[in-house]
UniProtKB/Swiss-Prot annotation:
The LID domain closes over the active site upon ATP binding. It comes from Salmonella dublin (strain CT_02021853). Catalyzes the specific phosphorylation of the 3-hydroxyl group of shikimic acid using ATP as a cosubstrate. This is Shikimate kinase 2. PROSITE patterns: SHIKIMATE_KINASE.
């Protein structure tokens, strides 16, 4: 059994898209902390935040992280999962953490194109480009501190997956076949 692979990064960096492709390429299971949380509490992230505040959401997010963490699993995390010290230490100790890094312009373009964007609560109440810039400035150091590997997420998903697989230690590269040749 292999350690879980945790994908971290801001909204729009491709954690879910890359995570599903990486799981397929490695034969690992795929889990998404936000989706797990929403399916278990039957509320959107925005509804959880409205009813319980960010503190309540962050506590539930930690529970989701622990629930989906299992060997041979690719875990797409919420963008703010690194805000909790426990989560950073847990992921770094239990698995391999990969920071999907992308510039503000890429993140904004992707978020504007997402149909689910309205389901996410604003973090600052500011226009999207300003919010993304501010949030990334606040969190980038935490993503980097937590990550074992930093991967450029501006490329096509297949290329990002290939780069992740190439970066991983051989013991983690248990593939069912080279999907992206």
């Amino acid at each position: 059994m292999m350690q879980p692979l945790y994908l971290v990064g801001p909204r729009g960096c491709g954690k879910t898209t890359i995570g599903m492709a990486l799981a397929q390429a490695t034969g690992f299971r795929f889990a998404d902390t936000d989706r797990w949380l929403q399916s278990h509490v039957q509320m959107s992230v925005a509804d959880i935040v409205e009813k319980e505040g960010w503190g309540g959401f962050r506590a539930r997010e930690t529970a989701a992280l622990e629930a989906v963490s299992a060997p041979s699993t690719v875990v797409a995390t919420g963008g703010g999962i690194i805000l909790t010290d426990y989560n950073r230490r847990y992921m770094h100790r239990v698995g391999v953490v990969i920071y999907l890094c992308a510039p503000v312009s890429t993140l904004v373009n992707r978020l504007e194109a997402e149909p689910e964007a309205d389901l996410r609560p604003t973090l600052t109440g500011k226009p999207l480009s300003e919010e993304v810039r501010e949030v990334l400035e606040q969190r980038d150091a935490l993503y980097r501190e937590t990550a074992h590997y930093i991967i450029d997420a501006t490329k096509a998903p297949a290329q990002v997956v290939s780069e992740i697989i190439a970066a991983l230690p051989p013991s983690t590269q248990r593939l069912q076949g080279d999907v992206y040749t």
